[in-house]
Amino acid sequence: MSLMLEPNPTQIKEERIYAEMGLTDEEFAMVEKILGRLPNYTETGLFSVMWSEHCSYKNSKPVLRKFPTTGERVLQGPGEGAGIVDIGDNQAVVFKMESHNHPSAIEPYQGAATGVGGIIRDVFSMGARPVALLNSLRFGELQSPRVKYLFEEVVAGIAGYGNCIGIPTVGGEVQFDPCYEGNPLVNAMCVGLINHEDIKKGQAHGAGNTVMYVGASTGRDGIHGATFASEELSESSEAKRPAVQVGDPFMEKLLIEACLELIQSDALVGIQDMGAAGLTSSSAEMASKAGMGIEMYLDDVPQRETGMTPYEMMLSESQERMLIVVKKGREQEIVDLFEKYDLAAVTMGKVTEDKMLRLFHKGEKVAEVPADALAEEAPIYHKPSKEAAYFAEFQAMKMETPKVENYKETLFALLQQPTIASKEWVYDQYDYQVRTSTVVTPGSDAAVVRVRGTEKGLAMTTDCNSRYIYLDPEMGGKIAVAEAARNIVCSGGEPLAITDCLNFGNPEKPEIFWQIEKSVDGMSEACRTLQTPVIGGNVSMYNERSGEAVYPTPTVGMVGLVHDLKHVTTQEFKQAGDLVYVIGETKAEFGGSELQKMIHGKIFGQSPSIDLDVELKRQKQVLEAIQAGLVQSAHDVAEGGLAVAISESAIGAKGLGATVKLDGEATAALFAESQSRFVITVKRENKEAFEKVVEAIQVGEVTSTNEVTIHNEENEVLLTANVDEMRKAWKGAIPCLLK
């Protein structure tokens, strides 16, 4: 039996075995003090996963406290499986985003698939039916064979899981930069709907109540996954494939239906997903949140491998498992319910009053630790922070407009940059129409899903321009939230709240910690100004390979409320003769832009700037015009500037083009990436009414010529481009790079 091989408490201390599990000398001394004795092997394992950055946020908590987390509509902020926001009529939207970066770097298909599975469980553990999935992906340059492999496998993994489980993947974003070559980012978001009375918490109340294990059996996959996610990737990480879990979407589909039926039963007290740190986190957190303890008999854990030790069972991150607490005496009802779905439901313990997590195996007590010590009392570190050396240098640079010889060729080249190019190759692999509630499919500013039985819809998006955040973390943090809100507004939605996924390098490096602090400062300010509180999220640190960190990438997932589906607006032009308006001024801002990266092969200088009060004013005006029925199409101006935004609106339409006139220096007018700008089209008869509501400049009109023609203020033609040719270049870019 492998039990014989476990080191004893003295060996764990003297041979510093705890260090291999991720605990520091000081942390091990704290554990010894909490217990009043040396921990055994299982107990050391419990502390090592629960005190990892991934589970405890020990390095990021002081920064996360800056986020605004309350608001009129917020029913549940950070701290539970997912956040919840009221949408009226006794309904609420539940959503959360999480990362699965490290597993996806090692085993991309399963890493991405189980990332999707985990975030779905977070949402239905709150009592909500999952209705949509989104993702935000980062990879190196597609010229590299390894990157092509990671990209193809990650997309296949997301598709494989989401399509089988029957939840539409409706939106997302993909960006490519060399810094992600060895460390891709895979962030998955799930959105669910719930009635107020069905909201459930992951809390173990009521001494004597029964603790039950439901779902798939436990294997050795994913042991120490949380610890693995709290260290840098290296050559030896390849050997950690066992730390990557394997998902079964068909099992999860059954689990969703069983749990949603269970939630209607008054026998249920609390429910939580076994996510990172598996049984350890679910039991310790449920006990701690309720101010109770839990006693568990590990012989009763359904196991799919023989001879598993308590340590292995507690730390396994096998997928498709939930821990539930039910009223004493009602266990058989639960067993019967799960049996109907061919799922196991096993009694394995009870709730106690003494606040201890106590584990038994083969008649012996194998662990006894305070639940609060695991769930709440991890040390909190105030890491040293130091402004990155490059920042002052970039801020002092005198920025020059990139030299462009041929505007048309430059536009075509930009449309073929993988970050701008059509992502159809990606989303064509996703079933985005399953459940038949998708109103706006992938490819527009935000996806929209109808709320059945009402006239309402939910708009949703993921956004983050990591280049801006690298150049100026605080300004970039503001832009990430503002762009997400702009996308929601362009779709006809009122921004409600955000979930975030903070992807950074090693927080022990002062310059990385400075990036974390500053970007959170920027995001927090934007959330306050735009009234979109943070209702939950995830931190992913140590995204480095060979000491090189990824760009700071605090991804924003935002959900908005479309009050009436009549207001749903998309980015493509609708009919010839409509007037084209631009909202917002264009400045020669090229730092971190697609044009700068394309011409110079790198990014430098100052990021675009943003005034949040101006942003809010413009968003409110655009939303008011949309809700008044005055807007035909709306598109946010982002990567590639106005020329790309206008071209995208033409590409999305059939047989339409536009003739527009842009003032100012030509390269900036066409390609600068100034913030808070929109391209809007309006019916001619609504011109006056629209101009009363929105401060905008009419720049041209939609034509039936199938060409985009852009003039300068002297009326000289800067470029004329055939829309079919642009569409072909834009759609063909990613498939061509993958050949």
From Swiss-Prot:
- In terms of superkingdom, the source organism counts as Bacteria
Q: What is its main location?
A: cytoplasm
Q: So, what pathway does this thing act in?
A: Purine metabolism; IMP biosynthesis via de novo pathway; 5-amino-1-(5-phospho-D-ribosyl)imidazole from N(2)-formyl-N(1)-(5-phospho-D-ribosyl)glycinamide: step 1/2
Matches recorded under Gene3D superfamilies: PurM-like C-terminal domain, PurM-like, N-terminal domain
Active-site residues are H54, H100
The alphabetized list of GO BP terms reads: 'de novo' IMP biosynthetic process; purine nucleotide biosynthetic process
User: Could you confirm whether the keyword Iron appears in this record?
Assistant: no
For whether the record's keyword set contains Magnesium, the answer is yes
Q: Where can this protein be found?
A: Cytoplasm
Question: What class does this enzyme belong to in the EC scheme?
Answer: ligase
Q: Which reactions are catalysed by this chain?
A: N(2)-formyl-N(1)-(5-phospho-beta-D-ribosyl)glycinamide + L-glutamine + ATP + H2O = 2-formamido-N(1)-(5-O-phospho-beta-D-ribosyl)acetamidine + L-glutamate + ADP + phosphate + H(+)
Main function: Part of the phosphoribosylformylglycinamidine synthase complex involved in the purines biosynthetic pathway. Catalyzes the ATP-dependent conversion of formylglycinamide ribonucleotide (FGAR) and glutamine to yield formylglycinamidine ribonucleotide (FGAM) and glutamate. The FGAM synthase complex is composed of three subunits. PurQ produces an ammonia molecule by converting glutamine to glutamate. PurL transfers the ammonia molecule to FGAR to form FGAM in an ATP-dependent manner.
State what protein this is by name. Answer: Phosphoribosylformylglycinamidine synthase subunit PurL
